[in-house]
């Protein structure tokens, strides 16, 4: 299931692209969250090779131009790799609907997941930033 991680990560990356010396406290104030949440998110973005930082130097910087960072890349960096939709796991096998619901929905849900990922892949951080500035 999607939560707000993708939106928060894009928010963080947009701020960092404007000013690489922006602290996690300033970012947290903009996102309206705790600086610890921001630092965790920044850590995930570093592991995904989207951000970099240097010891002793405040802030972080983008490793690539915003136009070269797809929203899918950001999504995969911060979102657990699970299906977008979940089907309840233990429907009643004696029920005519319960015994077939998972198979009936699998193809549709997988198709929607692919469509979402394709759309995210077609959009960049720069595309979002163009709407911001």
From Swiss-Prot:
<feature type="DNA-binding region" description="H-T-H motif">
    <location>
        <begin position="24"/>
        <end position="47"/>
    </location>
</feature>
<dbReference type="InterPro" id="IPR036390">
    <property type="entry name" value="WH_DNA-bd_sf"/>
</dbReference>
<feature type="domain" description="HTH rrf2-type">
    <location>
        <begin position="1"/>
        <end position="130"/>
    </location>
</feature>
<keyword id="KW-0805">Transcription regulation</keyword>
<dbReference type="InterPro" id="IPR036388">
    <property type="entry name" value="WH-like_DNA-bd_sf"/>
</dbReference>
<dbReference type="GO" id="GO:0005829">
    <property type="term" value="C:cytosol"/>
</dbReference>
<dbReference type="GO" id="GO:0003700">
    <property type="term" value="F:DNA-binding transcription factor activity"/>
</dbReference>
<dbReference type="Pfam" id="PF02082">
    <property type="entry name" value="Rrf2"/>
</dbReference>
<protein>
    <recommendedName>
        <fullName>Putative HTH-type transcriptional regulator YwnA</fullName>
    </recommendedName>
</protein>
<dbReference type="GO" id="GO:0006355">
    <property type="term" value="P:regulation of DNA-templated transcription"/>
</dbReference>
<keyword id="KW-0238">DNA-binding</keyword>
<dbReference type="GO" id="GO:0003677">
    <property type="term" value="F:DNA binding"/>
</dbReference>
<dbReference type="InterPro" id="IPR000944">
    <property type="entry name" value="Tscrpt_reg_Rrf2"/>
</dbReference>
<keyword id="KW-0804">Transcription</keyword>
